[in-house]
């Protein structure tokens, strides 16, 4: 049976990085599945809590440091100024002229990134309606990790688009373009 899969469709076979994509989706789905099946069948809170936290931590790390960079060309981190103790987020995006983002990878990435916090919110309502408030502690931790990555990658994408737009607009004006590209590039890539 032959299927015509268009560019950008949700098929992992069209991915530029299928192993990265499958690991990314595996981490995203595994914490939800362990929580769901643990809550419904096992009922051992401590075991499910520990396994889910470990999977959420692995998902957070893999998404932040590997999947974001390879699938959509985005990366973020938090820096602390040693002199003042101030903390700020640093965003990095790949150069669109050197790295072409696969539409399939991008669709999988953004869909999984935005849907997981919504699923955890839904599970919070389930825990509330079932009067299992102890499970809310795990959901709050899951939401804090997934929402942090979601907000950071959303900001990173906006800053990356803004820097690319500013760099290309100023690029046509010669010296001003070189100055703008160098300044913006240095600001967003540390």
From Swiss-Prot:
InterPro entries recorded: TVP23-like
Gene Ontology annotations for the cellular component aspect, listed alphabetically: Golgi membrane
GO-annotated biological processes: protein secretion; vesicle-mediated transport
Keyword Membrane part of the UniProt annotation: yes
Domain of life: Eukaryota
Location(s) in or outside the cell: Golgi apparatus membrane
Pfam families per record: DUF846
Entry keyword set: Golgi apparatus, Membrane, Transmembrane, Transmembrane helix
Primary localization: Golgi
Membrane topology term: Multi-pass membrane protein
Membrane-crossing segments per the record: 14-34, 36-56, 107-129, 134-153
PANTHER family documented for this protein: GOLGI APPARATUS MEMBRANE PROTEIN TVP23
Biological role stated in the UniProt entry: Golgi membrane protein involved in vesicular trafficking.
Family from the record: Belongs to the TVP23 family.
Protein name: Golgi apparatus membrane protein tvp23
UniProt organism field: Botryotinia fuckeliana (strain B05.10)
